[in-house]
Amino acid sequence: MASPDKKSSLAALTLAAVGIVYGDIGTSPLYTMKEVFSKEHGLDLTPENLLGVVSLIVWGLIIIVSLKYVTLVLRANNRGEGGIMALMALALSSVTKNSRWYFPLMVMGLFGATLFYGDSVITPAISVLSAVEGLGVATSAFDPYVVPVTVAILVGLYSLQARGTAGIGKWFGPVMLIWFITLAVMGVVNIIDAPYILHALNPWHALHFLSGNGFLAFIALGAVVLAFTGAEALYADMGHFGAKPIRMAWFLIAFPALSLNYLGQGALLLLNPEAVTNPFYQQLGAWSIYPLVALSTMAAIIASQATISGTFSMTKQAIALGFLPRMKIEFTSASQIGQIYIPAVNWLQMIVVVLAVIGFGSSSNLAAAYGIAVTATMMVTTVLTFFVIRYRWKYNLILCVAATGFFLVIDLSLFSANMLKLFHGGWFPLLLGVVLFTLMLTWKRGRELVFENLQKHAIPLEDFLASLFISPPTRVPGTAIFLRGESDGVPHAMLHNLSHNKVLHERVVFLTVRMMEVPYVPKADQVRIEHLGDDCYQMNVTYGFKNVPDIPAALDLAKEQGLEFEMMETSFFIARQTVVANPVRGMALWREHIFVAMSRHARGAADYYQIPSNRVIELGTKVEI
């Protein structure tokens, strides 16, 4: 029997998961039904079509969210961490680097991750915009103010990011719980008025709708997918809450509430087809519009916050895995290490979100932009999951194909339906994804070219030290730490120091930082020291992609292995690389120029590794790619 403390902890995590994980999918009822039956889709609002659409949505929640994500994908975790970056790292670890699958899997996972950035722009825009549009249901006099009010809310939200969410974050769970209870109550009220809608629970109506409406049903699928946006968040946030609280929050709260509300909106439209212009806000009558606008705006802000935080987390992982240059990362909570803020990402995302709101102008226009990136990410997740369960878990091939193939057919159907919206806004998140994909691959390849160049001119460290101490230079008091990449040979900073200063510190440490394709490396395994002789040491510091790189903390850990450091007697020598594009070799010249620009704006190693600036000596070196 579980102890009371464990039960209360599980309940707290479940409530927190309701607030963070389900904000996106929880706000989908604001716009999904409205979009399915919009005039542009040409689908008649008949009782038969209503039953079919509601049945599609409810069974989509069962198959896509409950079975695929909650039951299968949550099991494919990378040491407890989820998200497409973690899944990509797990899939890559399932095959060797020489495997024919390695590069395609990396490209696929990377493209899925960049599509997440496209989603992260659309989610705040469509969530807040659709919430504020409720004012227009009350009176058309509010229509001119919908976009300005939305922009003001979003600018305010992004402006507060630097302060962190630790203070208001504790209210996310209770507010979203009230939101889901409200969804359920509204649904039940309308179902009581038109219980015939419960026939939609029979999947035959979904199948009959698809077979009986031909191309119109195919078009409708592109709008139905709006009910499943946010499913990826279930997996992405697993590291914060664990699989069990996420599952409990889904099956006990989110899924019943969403199903009841979609059934309720269907019941409302059976009785009052004119409500199709915005069925969500007309479920309880005119008296409820203003309270619902207030509550839905809070829910939309929470959904947006979860997406923004997810973007910060994804960026940090991408930096650690070598797909993006180092950036300034601020920690906004002393107690919660996952609470981070990346200024460059925050302001750039805010600008793009505001432009999306102004450019598209309404949630209906944004809805056209939403589905392609979401369904493409779903496909990538399914394929990566196949490689994990087949090559890492060693499940039977037929079982793996059957399990993931079923979901892949659904993903492909939804993706194909959304491709019809490519020229009606679907290009927007795809363009964002392609731009970021190009930048990430360019950075990854550029770093490889820099490494190859340095390797060509590298002097083996052991041979160099052996020859150096035949006629040793003058030793001066203190400790010198030279940052050195894996297999880099003698650090350029050391060669420059010996060339210019003609001296060597009495203790020399070569420090190599390695990032592993796992979320976390325990402190006990982070530091390894090898004695090279003559008071020279090789110190390897290993982090996972969700660890916080902290060299001073690593030096403290070195005490346990007999190497103590006094910071005021320690100097860090770091080579500052100036990268120069070479038209003869390497990448295409335009990509090389992009890489050079990214390198120029990358955060310095000293800042990124939290090395005190007054202990750092930077020495320049030029590298051609």
Swiss-Prot record:
Listed GO molecular functions? Answer: potassium ion transmembrane transporter activity; symporter activity
InterPro entries from the UniProt entry: K+_transporter, K_trans_C, K_trans_N, Kup
Catalytic activity reads:
K(+)(in) + H(+)(in) = K(+)(out) + H(+)(out)
Q: Where in the cell is it found?
A: Cell inner membrane
Q: Which GO terms describe its cellular component?
A: plasma membrane
- A Pfam family cross-referenced in the UniProt record is K_trans
- Origin: domain of life: Bacteria
State the annotated membrane topology for this chain.
Multi-pass membrane protein
For this UniProt entry, which segments traverse the membrane?
10-30, 50-70, 102-122, 135-155, 172-192, 214-234, 251-271, 284-304, 340-360, 369-389, 397-417, 422-442
Q: Which controlled-vocabulary keywords does the entry list? A: Cell inner membrane, Cell membrane, Ion transport, Membrane, Potassium, Potassium transport, Symport, Transmembrane, Transmembrane helix, Transport
What is this protein for, i.e. what is its function?
Answer: Transport of potassium into the cell. Likely operates as a K(+):H(+) symporter.
Family statement: Belongs to the HAK/KUP transporter (TC 2.A.72) family.
Q: What is this protein called?
A: Probable potassium transport system protein Kup
Lineage runs:
Bacteria, Pseudomonadati, Pseudomonadota, Betaproteobacteria, Burkholderiales
Q: What gene is this protein a product of?
A: kup
